[in-house]
């Protein structure tokens, strides 16, 4: 059974464990804790176990922005990221929703296009040699 809810402090350890970056970057673990405490982190549970998380805030030019989307390695390629994106879009309290990903992340590009996003621009100089592509999706009722 799949359930998506706002992450709570008791989820933090599991979110850090599924995050491939947090395994070697303590600052990511601290960021996960901050997102949970801020009430912007949503966790996707499969049979009660944390499988993925996403972070949605509304501080990107007063628009919704999916800041992070992470699926645990053992749960990838099962459609969970798409379900999480759709959940975050439904939670967006603004008429515009944005997100971004590196140019090299072709799997995320495909997911976003399938979820109704369109490319909206790019940002150079975040990751050397791998621009950040920005994507946009209108939100009905936002």
Residue ranges, per PLM feature:
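Acetyl-CoA-dependent GNAT
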Residues: 2, 6-68, 72, 85, ...
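Short acidic/polar active-site loop segments enriched in Thr and Asp
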Residues: 62, 95, 118
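A short, internal acetyl-CoA/4′-phosphopantetheine-binding micro-motif in the GNAT/acyltransferase core
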Residues: 69-76, 101-103
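Conserved acetyl-CoA-binding loop-helix of GNAT-fold acetyltransferases
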Residues: 71, 77-90, 110, 114
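Conserved GNAT acetyl-CoA-binding A-motif
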Residues: 91-103
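Conserved catalytic-core motifs of GNAT/GCN5-like acyltransferases
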Residues: 98-100, 116-134
